[in-house]
Amino acid sequence: MSKILGRLVSRLNQIRRLKESRKYITVNEYFSQVKSIIFTNSRHLKEENKKFGKLNGDITFYVIRRTPPGAGLFSNYLLVLMHLKYAELNSLTPIIDYKNYSNYYSGKSNSTSENYWDNYWDQPTEYNLDEVYKSSNVILSSANISKLLEKNYGYYDLNSKKFLENQRQINDFNGISNSIKLRRSVKEKVNNDLKSIFASKQNILGISLRGTDYLNTNLAKGHYKPLNIDEAILLTEKKLVEWKMDYVFVCTEVKEYIELYVERFGEKALFLKRQRFSNSQSEKFITQYRFRRNNDSFETGLEYLREVYL
């Protein structure tokens, strides 16, 4: 009886959490996930084998997708890297599809949706989605491949401590990451940022600080707790001396952190000028907050991408 009750509670909790994302996904996606929770105790997409048409009979395509509405830009990116490794290990031809699955960057999926991936990065193949969805051998990916990668191939989840302690796997995935090229227009913006922010400056320490939804223990389950701002500044002071650095580049979505770094380090504090959030905006996932500007979802993703690449 207790096991049955536990399963029921688990399903009800998942449906409750799904309701929080309801306005970011389509009606069909919502009820499909509710159905999946009821029958499988998981809302996430499962791997499927499909035959959509007669094209490319000698190729097996691997469509990389994520359960709508997905997550933040680099959470999605890391998931794609793991799927690309799986495709490589199984001699599959990968393509990333964020057009037919609702997400925070291109909105609810519809007939006019863009594949937001193509706004930031090139595809890992010369084929396009239209051709793939007319082909005879297509695998639609599961939402997350990390457990299968570890169980069958010994590759660790990119978010895990075990991965960060394995230099061979770091090098392996670094190679995969380098094969994913920034879209030319984005690359040009990054190069301009490099020139305008760093110019001829040398000996620059980089620090990445998360706040906002990472400070909410209910939203950040499964994530490591970030340094608080006092800890970060103390560590920065120590490393500037220890590593003989002249500047510190601060990568963060939190405007208060930038202000405190400028207050403490003055002109030694370097940063990308962009829209940032307040730490008080921690009641929802950061991807659910919006700035009042045209095409904000794309612009916020682009600013984050440029900052991380610096």
Residue ranges of each PLM-predicted region?
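Donor-binding and catalytic core of enzymes assembling or modifying cell-surface/extracellular glycoconjugates
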Residues: 244-310
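Boundary detector for helix-to-coil junctions that initiate low-complexity/charged tails
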Residues: 1-22
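Secretory-pathway glycan-assembly enzymes, especially type II membrane glycosyltransferases
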Residues: 18, 23-236, 242-243
